[in-house]
């Protein structure tokens, strides 16, 4: 199966939206979705939401939060990046 890495996954809009798009793709069923963000609190919140949705809908995906970027990208098949530069 594929390893899909989402860099900047802690964003409620990008993270959850992209995870939902992946969940809807029949060709990606069984993939591991690696969530990465430098904000560990946001990463935890998105991971919990994704896991809850995955379990509720009995989806065949693995969700893996990783705070180390190099570890997250190791052996990735796909990488989607959405980050904000600078301060809000």
Give the residues covered by each predicted segment.
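Metallocofactor- and cofactor-centric catalytic cores in central/energy metabolism, strongly enriched
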Residues: 1-88
